[in-house]
């Protein structure tokens, strides 16, 4: 019998307990001897030095385990907004997911963002309400919050039992059983407990079973008939109905417990096996697809690879090697199975989304993604498409300590930019680089990795806000000529503003008709490249239409000459006075204890923020505000000081506003 495969991702807001739950899952499955603690830097899934130091997930860690004859590939994704591209790439490789909701904080900003990504990507999702080790946190309130904010009806599968103010067991709705801890800390069924023996929580367990039957009856006629006739529905039949329910958009199966104390985890894993889909069928002509790139010190670059074929080692293409990836360790395998995930080393440099056919040659699929993570095909995203989904908000100048290291730093930055589509590198003719990042955390991590993993000694300037530059008016044509020896290039160029953020390049009919394809492509590429740095150097030039009214060239003109001629023409054409700066405006979502609410809110207002939404429950204060990014640059340190480290916040780009 072929062992079924489940590819699962786990998502959450920062500090909801996602990695702690991942560790508990691995412990329950027997993959680790004890669950590693995030706060001690011992989490198995967070293997990078930066992850251990910061206590956050940066790269999507992959683990493998077996549970009751089902093989799981388990991907722990980052919760921090700076690493949203990691989440998008993880979702390209899975069919199911666990979304963790903290009972302490409820549905938070990144919870909503993650849920939206899951829905638009078509990934079936199971919820886990965490942090119920504290009886002061209400499961009922969390369920109401889920329904109100996420718009799905949670169907409860487990709930906690308390004794002396501590969680002591969980009740499993489907199996009608009670799970407690054994002497080794594992969850086991309590054989001394029976739901029909009149225990205090028996009535509540039966109530949730009846609710599950009621919800499942909307998807299963057999269950509906038994329910109408007033007959009991056996667990196996309910299981079948809940499988159909789990595939709907109206409901979400919900497990509840405490990852920290290891309650509710065993039932959750069984639920992942029961209710999440198996891997789909693939084209057997394909060996598989690159879904992620990784770099390890001492190992070098590897590709995370999703196999599309079953193939034994003797049939692997020449030069290819496949392994299991456990944190940063490579474990050899003797065969690959369709749908399974492996680490791959190949004789050539790979790119995200590349499909490799069985003979070892490459096809690069034309897939694309939206900013919300929606797949327009079943293929993993290519870096070139995913880059368009993330807007870098910071730019930082970096240069070598020693000029002899230039080539090494250049190669290292190339590897990092290929690994992370949201990170971009801009080369300057002066011998330095600008690093374009989504946020400060991403920048700090990249600089640390350059030093630790690649051995690069660089000097980094202070990060600056990336503004948008826009034309104020239509600009009359200019002419420019560039000549080296007998080779000459001339261009006549004008520019006008567009209402959108797009770039448009219009070529004269004569030029289009007479120029060869490589010349046309070279001109387009050269003009687009000038928009990356802008005129003032503050950020990209957007919303512009270049019109090439005339273009002449001599045979033998090289691409660098075209680039130089076009760049000089743009410099002639657009002056600083022609530019209006637009600054990024962020939506700040923050929560803190109520006793810090006044200080935190006052600080945001002093930074030019406009509070637009206030909430909370009398214990936790929440609010949303629109604030210019330049006013909250380095905000993490300030809010940590004001709130004594108790505030949590996230930022989302709303758009750009003209600077006064």
At which residue positions do the language-model features occur?
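Structural and coupling elements of P-loop NTPases
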Residues: 1-660
């Amino acid at each position: 019998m072929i062992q079924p495969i489940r590819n699962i991702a786990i998502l959450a807001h920062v500090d909801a307990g996602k990695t702690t739950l991942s560790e508990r899952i691995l412990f329950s499955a027997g993959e680790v001897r004890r669950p590693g603690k995030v706060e001690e830097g011992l989490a198995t899934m967070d293997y990078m030095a930066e992850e251990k130091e910061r206590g956050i997930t940066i790269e999507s860690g992959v683990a493998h385990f077996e549970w009751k004859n089902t093989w799981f590939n388990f991907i722990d994704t980052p919760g921090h907004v700076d690493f949203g591209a990691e989440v998008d790439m993880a979702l390209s490789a899975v069919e199911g997911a666990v979304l963790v909701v903290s009972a302490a904080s409820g549905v938070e900003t990144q919870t909503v963002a993650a849920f939206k990504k899951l829905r638009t990507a078509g990934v079936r999702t199971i919820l886990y309400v965490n942090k119920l080790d504290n009886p002061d946190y209400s499961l009922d309130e969390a369920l109401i919050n889920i329904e109100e904010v996420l718009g799905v009806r949670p169907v409860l599968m487990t709930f906690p039992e308390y004794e002396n103010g501590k969680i002591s067991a969980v009740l499993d709705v489907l199996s009608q059983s009670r799970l407690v801890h054994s002497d080794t800390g594992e969850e086991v069924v309590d054989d001394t407990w029976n739901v029909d023996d009149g225990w205090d929580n028996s009535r509540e367990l039966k109530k949730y079973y009846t609710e599950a039957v009621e919800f499942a009856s909307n998807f299963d006629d057999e269950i509906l008939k038994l329910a109408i006739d007033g007959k009991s529905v056996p667990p196996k039949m309910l299981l079948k109905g809940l499988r159909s329910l789990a595939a709907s958009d109206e409901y979400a199966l919900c497990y509840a417990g405490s990852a920290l104390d290891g309650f509710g985890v065993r039932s959750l894993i069984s639920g992942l096996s029961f209710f999440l889909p198996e891997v789909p069928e693939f084209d057997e002509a394909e060996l598989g697809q690159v879904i992620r790139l990784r770099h390890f010190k001492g190992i070098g670059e590897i590709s995370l690879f999703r196999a599309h074929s079953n193939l034994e080692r003797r049939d692997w293409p020449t030069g290819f090697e496949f392994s299991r990836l456990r944190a940063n360790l490579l474990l050899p395998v003797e065969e690959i199975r369709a749908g399974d995930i492996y680490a791959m080393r190949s004789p050539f440099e790979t790119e995200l989304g590349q499909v490799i056919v069985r003979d070892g040659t490459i096809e690069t699929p034309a897939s694309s993604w939206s900013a919300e993570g929606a797949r327009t095909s079943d293929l993993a995203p290519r870096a070139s498409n995913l880059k368009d989904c993330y807007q870098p908000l910071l730019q930082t100048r970096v240069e070598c300590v020693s000029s002899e290291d230039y080539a090494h730093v250049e190669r290292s930055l190339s590897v990092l930019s290929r690994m992370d589509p949201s990170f971009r590198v801009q080369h300057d003719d002066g011998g330095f680089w600008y690093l374009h990042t989504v946020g400060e955390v991403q920048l700090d991590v990249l600089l640390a990795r350059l030093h630790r993993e690649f051995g690069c000694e660089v000097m980094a300037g202070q990060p600056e806000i990336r503004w948008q530059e826009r034309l104020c008016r239509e600009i009359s044509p200019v002419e420019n000529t560039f000549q080296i020896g007998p080779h000459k290039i001339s261009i006549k160029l004008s520019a006008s503003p567009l209402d959108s953020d797009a770039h448009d390049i219009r070529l004269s009919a004569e030029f289009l008709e007479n120029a060869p394809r490589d010349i046309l492509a070279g001109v387009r590429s050269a003009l687009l490249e000038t928009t990356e740095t802008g005129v003032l150097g503050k950020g990209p030039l957007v919303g512009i239409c270049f019109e090439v009214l005339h273009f002449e060239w001599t045979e033998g003109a090289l691409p660098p000459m075209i680039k130089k001629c076009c760049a000089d023409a743009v410099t002639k054409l657009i002056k600083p006075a022609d530019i209006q700066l637009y600054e990024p405006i962020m939506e700040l979502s923050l929560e803190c204890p109520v006793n810090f609410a006044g200080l935190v809110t006052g600080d945001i207002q002093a930074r030019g923020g406009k509070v637009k939404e206030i909430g909370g429950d009398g214990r936790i204060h929440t609010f949303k505000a629109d604030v210019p990014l330049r006013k909250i640059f380095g905000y993490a340190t300030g809010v940590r000081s004001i709130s004594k480290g108790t505030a949590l916040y996230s930022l989302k780009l709303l758009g750009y506003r003209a600077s006064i």
